[in-house]
Amino acid sequence: MGAKDYIGSLFLTELIKGLALTGRHLFARKITVQFPEEKTPASPRFRGLHALRRYPNGEERCIACKLCEAVCPALAITIESEQRDDGSRRTKRYDIDLTKCIFCGFCEEACPVDAVVETRVMEYHGEKRGDLYYTKQMLLAVGDRYEAQIAADREADAKYR
């Protein structure tokens, strides 16, 4: 320990530097948002509540390829399909268990027809475990309710896909 280090520790220069740094940040503008009262805008890529989309003619987009079910790391998606008379497949059952879902977005990326999407909706709850088990009809209702926002988000994100 040299003389310079000894004098520096004697006058507590490091402590004074730390207090100066704390003092500068103490009077800086606060950036904390009081969430329920104040809301910040969510990104178009925000991954919230799931939705199933329809084509403009009203037909559901899901072709029952089951890629979303296969790619889901949490095994939160359950799909049962049926063959139609015209040869196409459609879902008979499409369920998402939100208690298992980790909101990774893999289902959205895997879907070849943009049928399953994650919306910006982050405020949903359930009083019982079963309330967070979304069926096909519930997911289609979410998609119908937020279709304008979903379409705008997809358009804003199109150049990155």
From Swiss-Prot:
Q: Which reaction does it catalyse?
A: a quinone + NADH + 5 H(+)(in) = a quinol + NAD(+) + 4 H(+)(out)
The top EC class, named as a word, is translocase
E.C. number, please? 7.1.1.-
Q: Which PROSITE patterns match?
A: 4FE4S_FER_1, 4FE4S_FER_2
User: Which parts of the sequence bind [4Fe-4S] cluster 1?
Assistant: 62, 65, 68, 111
Q: Does the keyword Zinc apply?
A: no
Q: Which residues bind [4Fe-4S] cluster 2?
A: 72, 101, 104, 107
Q: How is the cofactor bound?
A: Binds 2 [4Fe-4S] clusters per subunit.
Membrane topology qualifier: Peripheral membrane protein
Gene Ontology cellular component?
plasma membrane
Q: Where is the 4Fe-4S ferredoxin-type domain?
A: 52-82, 92-121
**InterPro entries, alphabetized:** 4Fe4S_Fe-S-bd, 4Fe4S_Fe_S_CS, NADH_quinone_OxRdtase_chainI
MF-aspect GO terms: 4 iron, 4 sulfur cluster binding; iron ion binding; NADH:ubiquinone reductase (non-electrogenic) activity; quinone binding
Show the PANTHER family listed in the entry.
NADH DEHYDROGENASE [UBIQUINONE] IRON-SULFUR PROTEIN 8, MITOCHONDRIAL, NADH DEHYDROGENASE UBIQUINONE IRON-SULFUR PROTEIN 8, MITOCHONDRIAL
**Function (record text):** NDH-1 shuttles electrons from NADH, via FMN and iron-sulfur (Fe-S) centers, to quinones in the respiratory chain. The immediate electron acceptor for the enzyme in this species is believed to be ubiquinone. Couples the redox reaction to proton translocation (for every two electrons transferred, four hydrogen ions are translocated across the cytoplasmic membrane), and thus conserves the redox energy in a proton gradient.
Q: Which family does it belong to?
A: Belongs to the complex I 23 kDa subunit family.
Instruction: Spell out the subunit comment.
Output: NDH-1 is composed of 14 different subunits. Subunits NuoA, H, J, K, L, M, N constitute the membrane sector of the complex.
**What is the official name of this protein in its record?**
NADH-quinone oxidoreductase subunit I
- Recorded source organism is Aromatoleum aromaticum (strain DSM 19018 / LMG 30748 / EbN1)
